[in-house]
């Protein structure tokens, strides 16, 4: 990409403070699934009811291991002449190997789309500015628009934003060149902050095979079908649901810490004069005002005003954000 040097690393901003911004999603990647059996094959692999996915939809689900634990989250949509999903770059090669395990028995090809460009567009007046760049924009009711060389995805949470998926650098470079004098250019950490704010679970390599989908907010987001047929891990996911034995949940924590914690670090909760372990960090970003956002999966047997910290950080103080994640409305998503 010609303009890659424009995307500087800066402390992130909350969605309500974000100016018009273009974000290079270098920490995400794309896997393409093509071939005659692509729908049938993915139907047996992920938590989504794949045959119900329309051309103008995208949906977040999970690919699980046989124990029902998440190998990766997948943002699934139709792309070019097949299906594709966005996942974290740290998981791309592991995910490719897992998906290919049984592909020899099906007419399907699965590959990492190495040359694909992922650009996030967010912030103030995003739709107004993009109207001058694209003939048609996606909406909340039609969240994917396809053209010959690209697909454009719409997100309504935490505020309206877009994701450009281009099969070649030229579309991304064209957009950047056109917006160079209007936009702020940021690294992928800003998109990560927006995903934390939205309650979209961030599963990286350090946390794969640790959590069931319900613990990662995917049921609330409509990312698990309980009516489709079998898929890898389905028995465990269904049994957990119907027995009500899931004891963990996804939380958005805000506060301060001596440093930005690493993915997979432990969190502790204050219990009178002491602390005990309660969960693990999925993602964390430092904001421009010096505060810290942490996405974590925690045991949910505690008061919502509890004080937490990164393990061993004596001066740290984190609390559950007062802003709730957007919850799934069954009528709005027919494919889960």
Curated annotation (Swiss-Prot):
Pfam families: GCV_T, YgfZ_barrel. Keywords: Cytoplasm, Folate-binding, tRNA processing. GO terms for cellular component: cytoplasm. It comes from the Bacteria. GO terms for biological process: iron-sulfur cluster assembly; RNA modification; tRNA processing. Folate binds at residues 28, 191. The keyword RNA-binding does not apply. InterPro entries: GCV_T_N, GcvT/YgfZ_C, tRNA-modifying_YgfZ, YgfZ/GcvT, YgfZ/GcvT_CS, YgfZ_barrel. Its main location: cytoplasm. The keyword Ligase does not apply. Gene3D superfamilies: 2.40.30.160, 3.30.70.1630, Aminomethyltransferase beta-barrel domains. GO terms for molecular function: folic acid binding. It is found in: Cytoplasm. Folate-binding protein involved in regulating the level of ATP-DnaA and in the modification of some tRNAs. It is probably a key factor in regulatory networks that act via tRNA modification, such as initiation of chromosomal replication. Belongs to the tRNA-modifying YgfZ family. This is tRNA-modifying protein YgfZ. It comes from Hamiltonella defensa subsp. Acyrthosiphon pisum (strain 5AT). The lineage of its organism: Bacteria, Pseudomonadati, Pseudomonadota, Gammaproteobacteria, Enterobacterales.
